[in-house]
Amino acid sequence: MPGMPNPTQELKGKIPPHNLEAERAVLGAVLLDDSALSTATEQLSASSFYSAAHQRIFQALVELSDLGQRPDILVLSEHLRSCEALDFVGGSAYVASLTDAVPSAANVEYYTRIVCDAAMRRSLLKVARIITAEAFNDTVSGNIVLETAQREIYDLTNARRVATFKLLKNLIPDLVNTIETRYRNQSDLVGIATGLTALDNLTGGFQNSELIVIGARPSMGKTALAMTMASNIAIRQRIPTAFFSLEMSNLLLMQRLIAAESGVSATNLRKGLLQLSDFGRIQNAAGEMYDAPLYIVDVPNMKLLDLRAVARRLCVQEKIQIIFVDYLGLIVADNPFAPRYEQFAAISQSLKSLARELDIPIVALSQVGRPAEGSAPNLADIRGSGAIEQDADVVMFLHRDRNETETQLILAKQRNGPIGTVELEFQASFTRFVCKSP
């Protein structure tokens, strides 16, 4: 439309945000006082600098620090010369001039914030160009463009610095400290405890970046098991937890949760058949639950890209540490017209990627086919079994005779631990699972 401004055209020819004097001040501060490097590296990486010469100088300062050397002007110049980079950065004279840019290292944090802010603005412009290019591409759907935008912004929000390699000797102290802490605590748990002790003993708790799949036939109690775990994690341990309920409304989930926490029959709650004493138990349970960091998302037929977007937002805003998804078969794949097995594969791969991206465990429920009467389910029975078996770090199955309370939780796959069977008791009246008494 004539007269309408074109933001893309307006940006052409503009120099990206930067502040060379602040960059020189950061580098000069480090040369004056090597302890300033710790302050700078908390927010900056080499790519945070606009000048290519400054990028290489900062990287050299980090390299010298890693080697245990104090990076003064002479040492830095010799290091750059040995790397054949001294001429590239402007020679020894330019390196020496960096200390002229700042009287002392006292204000390095201030200069670092300026450089960091300019780097963030350049990154935002880069993301904007990526999104704009995809938005103009008619072969890419709007939903995919939205997913790209959400992913890029999330990555930008959380990418404080670029990934770096570490020498083995630099990793050993952290490992030794972790081992010593575990020894002092005398605990087998290295992940998030589910509250089902026998299961936690087998798994060591649910680990960050893991995809855990719980499979069962219909009406075996998948949701009840997931809610048992989620309530143990969020209510008793106060660990921020997200529960994506694609099958059941949040009101029904809360009704189940109140029954499980109060010990009041779920059937009586649903029908209103309550005794006066029940109200006190319900109020006590509600009080325990009130401040629990349990976030319920009840969107039927939720799209995969929406699930990822909400999960990212919850992790940023609420610091979620574990996600439950009930259940895989109700997630709408990005390509709903693909064959169903391809959709399952895409969903499985996406959830595993999301677990790694967010660095938290994701627990996904799944229905299994009907095995022969009386036989326990196995990996081949789970829908999308090929993809799930490949992507999941842990796969477990609920198994029991339909009208029995004694339940087996079969740990059929554990990438980093043993397999086995956990004996549980299903308390149907309260829609909860507990470990079977020995």
From Swiss-Prot:
Taxonomy, superkingdom: Bacteria
Binding positions for ATP per the UniProt entry: A216, R217, P218, S219, M220, G221, K222, T223
PROSITE patterns the UniProt entry points to: SF4_HELICASE
Pfam family, one: DnaB_C
Keywords: ATP-binding, DNA replication, DNA-binding, Helicase, Hydrolase, Isomerase, Nucleotide-binding, Primosome
Domain SF4 helicase: 185-438
One Gene Ontology term of the molecular function aspect: ATP binding
GO cellular component terms listed in the entry, alphabetical order: cytosol; primosome complex
Enzyme Commission number(s): 5.6.2.3
Catalysis performed (reactions): Couples ATP hydrolysis with the unwinding of duplex DNA at the replication fork by translocating in the 5'-3' direction. This creates two antiparallel DNA single strands (ssDNA). The leading ssDNA polymer is the template for DNA polymerase III holoenzyme which synthesizes a continuous strand; ATP + H2O = ADP + phosphate + H(+)
Disulfide partners: none
Biological process per Gene Ontology, one example term: DNA replication, synthesis of primer
Quaternary assembly: Homohexamer.
Function per UniProt: The main replicative DNA helicase, it participates in initiation and elongation during chromosome replication. Travels ahead of the DNA replisome, separating dsDNA into templates for DNA synthesis. A processive ATP-dependent 5'-3' DNA helicase it has DNA-dependent ATPase activity.
Similarity comment: Belongs to the helicase family. DnaB subfamily.
Name recorded for this polypeptide: Replicative DNA helicase DnaB
Species the sequence originates in: Treponema pallidum (strain Nichols)
